[in-house]
Amino acid sequence: MSSRITKQRLEDLLDRINQATGHKLEAWTQDETGRNRANVGTYVLDWAYGGVRLSQLTNEGGGERDITGRGTKRETYYRMHAFLDGLDAGQRGE
């Protein structure tokens, strides 16, 4: 029997990915003028159309690039684990 993949489990895995890549855990930061700015490079979860995907912020306005395709929570969980495994292998020089 497999365990339930929850939003919290995806968010925990997202934090691990951001930590492994040296990016901030928060997607947005308020600057000195009070405007919200995206933390460029930070990985985020994009929820829409009943699914979720892993994306990365590409500019201060909140533009994103897709890292994975949109899928169910379980599909995205497995894709995020594969992504993290690839990061770990690259850092080990494999």
Place the predicted regions along the sequence by residue.
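Short, charge-rich amphipathic interface segments used for partner binding and complex assembly
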Residues: 43-50, 82, 86
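Negatively charged, low-complexity tracts enriched in Asp/Glu with abundant Ser/Thr
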Residues: 1-41, 58-78, 82, 90-94
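Short aromatic-glycine-(Arg/Gly/Cys) micro-motifs in beta-strand/loop hairpins
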Residues: 45-63
